[in-house]
């Protein structure tokens, strides 16, 4: 009993922290919403600046408007002299510029081709200083998220004094100073290397940021596939030694959770994704059509599955909604809940696989990884996707008929939140079938399929009560398939034909992982699910850093789970001899026997 006391304390500390923090969310958000500040209206889809910010057209004149120093003629002359504008106008003969007042003391000049339908250049000029504040061409006109506005996603989480310490905290407990060139270190660095791409994105260098996102994804895909080989029974698994005792790591989880929630309440912004969840929840509650006819400030917010909007209903009911894109406390509450849920599920999966040490290590990895905080501080729904997939993996750790039905139901929920997890449905369906006789395999597949179909039908009722399947298909699948985006190599360089081949390859990988014999434990399932999601993300035209949490917890499950002992379904840690020193009290806690 003495040997397991610290472990029990760690479990209780994490559980108590999650309960306490959930209670704080429910009590603190309404009162603190006023301190959050005006949320930045960040759009993740293309939108005309003229339409989004409603500048006021100004006729050409030599007389400045009342209260302004510059006239519209002077503003146009300043813009005409810019080398970037001269270059783009040479490409579009007959182009012309229109002048607008933008806000109190800013001017906007928009250049159009001779037809007046295509905006080819945009300049923002400060009236007081006469300085050019912004100048954009190409896709950065329509895609405001490509302009590198400070804090547009996650606000201060992008600051180096937050981001870099998180990177250190993420890798430090897993670093082995005796083996600095271990493969695990390379894996963790690959996960952190998305930061390089993000740094270029934050400075509006899209032609650098987009290609730099692919090497770590390709590496992680190859790494996950390499872990699918069946482990040899005669070879002991490699061990992982944490740099700090498990109890201190559990305290780190509590501290980082508090930091994340505090930062969300006082500093984060709600992007259009979180706003869409609140709008959709309100429409369901008021018995309005879920798809089509959305507000102009989030016109395409109805591009997600119905589950996404239904899960926001409790938060919309508790925190309310003003009908505007304001601080949206409901979106804050939902994002915090999704984050806590993912943390708790990782702990539960790790505890079931090997014991509390692995559970705490996985929970710590989630709360220390900067890109999960990036998602939380943007108040998006991406941690919900991760949580639903993790719940399905947890269900897969049980060998009962009810667990099989649970996998099917959770797979349907994940697929009808965002559609990419649909690639995991075959994997989750076939997990564990190799251990069953043929009659039991058929029954298990039938139960999984029935649970999947039944859940999908049930959660679709609010949408189908007003919208046809065709309308839903048009607003979701068709819109996402047809929208162009510069946030992938396919959209940035016009490689749509190659993109189709990658999409086909991703589908083939997902199907192959479901039927080809592979490692059959939870480590194998996590690695296969991570590989399938990464393969899908490699083939989508609109990729963004918020999607990293979809596969990150699965990658960590595979990487740490394989080091924590043979087999991924061990419930209890290995027994400790009475005469041996307590494993949990060692300065460097070993996860393997």
Language-model segments: what does each one mean?
Residues 62-100, 157-163:
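Short, non-transmembrane alpha-helical segments in secretory-pathway proteins
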Residues 407-411, 420-434, 547-549:
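Transmembrane-embedded, aromatic-rich helix segments that form part
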Residues 1-3, 225-237, 396-407, 429-443, ...:
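Membrane-interface junctions at the ends of membrane-embedded or membrane-associated helices
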């Amino acid at each position: 009993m003495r040997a397991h006391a610290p472990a029990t304390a760690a479990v209780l500390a994490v559980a108590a922290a999650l309960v306490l923090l959930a209670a704080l969310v429910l009590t603190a958000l309404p009162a603190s919403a006023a301190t959050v500040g005006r949320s930045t209206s960040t759009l993740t889809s293309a939108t005309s600046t003229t339409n989004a910010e409603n500048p006021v057209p100004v006729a050409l004149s030599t007389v400045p408007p009342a209260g302004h120093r510059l006239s519209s003629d002077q503003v146009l002359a300043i813009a005409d002299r810019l080398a970037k504008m001269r270059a783009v106008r040479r490409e579009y003969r007959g182009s012309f510029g229109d002048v607008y007042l933008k806000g109190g003391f800013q001017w906007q000049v928009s250049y159009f081709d001779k037809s007046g339908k295509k905006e080819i250049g945009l300049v923002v000029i400060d009236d007081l200083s006469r300085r050019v504040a912004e100048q954009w061409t190409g896709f950065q006109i329509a895609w405001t998220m490509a302009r590198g506005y400070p804090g547009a996603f996650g606000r201060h989480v992008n600051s180096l004094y937050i981001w870099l310490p998180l990177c250190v905290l993420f890798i430090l407990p897993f670093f082995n100073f005796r083996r600095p060139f271990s493969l695990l270190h390379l894996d963790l660095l690959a996960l952190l290397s998305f930061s390089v791409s993000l740094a270029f994105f934050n400075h509006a260098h899209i032609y650098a940021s987009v290609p730099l996102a692919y090497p770590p994804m390709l590496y992680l895909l190859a790494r996950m596939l390499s872990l699918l080989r069946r482990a040899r029974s005669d070879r002991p698994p490699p061990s992982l030694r944490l740099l700090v005792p498990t109890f201190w790591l559990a305290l780190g989880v509590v501290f980082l959770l508090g930091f994340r929630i505090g930062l969300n309440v006082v500093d984060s912004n709600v992007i259009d994704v979180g706003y869409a969840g609140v709008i959709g929840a309100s429409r369901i509650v008021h018995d309005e059509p879920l798809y089509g006819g959305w507000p102009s400030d989030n016109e395409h917010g109805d591009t997600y599955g119905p589950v996404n909007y239904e899960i926001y209903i409790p938060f919309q009911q508790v925190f309310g909604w003003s009908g505007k894109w304001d601080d949206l406390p409901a979106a804050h509450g939902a994002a915090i809940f999704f984050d806590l849920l993912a943390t708790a599920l990782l702990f539960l999966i790790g505890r079931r696989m090997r014991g509390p040490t692995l559970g705490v290590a996985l929970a710590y990895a989630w709360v220390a990884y900067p890109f999960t905080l990036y998602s939380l501080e943007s108040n998006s729904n991406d941690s919900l996707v991760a949580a639903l997939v993790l719940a399905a993996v947890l269900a897969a750790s049980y060998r009962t008929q009810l667990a099989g039905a649970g996998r099917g139901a959770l797979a349907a929920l994940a697929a009808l939140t965002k559609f990419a997890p649909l690639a995991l449905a075959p994997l989750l369906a076939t997990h564990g079938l190799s251990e069953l006789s043929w009659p039991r395999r058929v029954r298990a597949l039938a139960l999984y399929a029935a649970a999947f179909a039944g859940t999908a039908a049930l959660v679709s009722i609010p949408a189908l009560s007003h919208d046809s399947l065709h309308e839903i298909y048009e607003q979701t699948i068709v819109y996402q398939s047809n929208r162009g985006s510069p946030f992938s190599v396919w959209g940035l360089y016009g490689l749509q034909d190659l993109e189709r081949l990658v999409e086909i390859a991703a589908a083939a990988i997902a199907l192959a992982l479901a039927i080809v014999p592979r490692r059959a434990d939870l480590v194998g399932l996590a690695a296969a699910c991570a590989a399938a999601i990464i393969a899908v993300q490699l083939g989508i035209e609109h990729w963004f850093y918020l999607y990293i949490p979809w596969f990150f917890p699965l990658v960590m499950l595979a990487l740490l789970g394989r080091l924590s002992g043979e087999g991924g379904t061990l419930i209890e840690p290995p027994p400790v001899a009475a005469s041996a020193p307590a494993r949990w009290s060692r300065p460097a806690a070993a996860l393997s026997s």
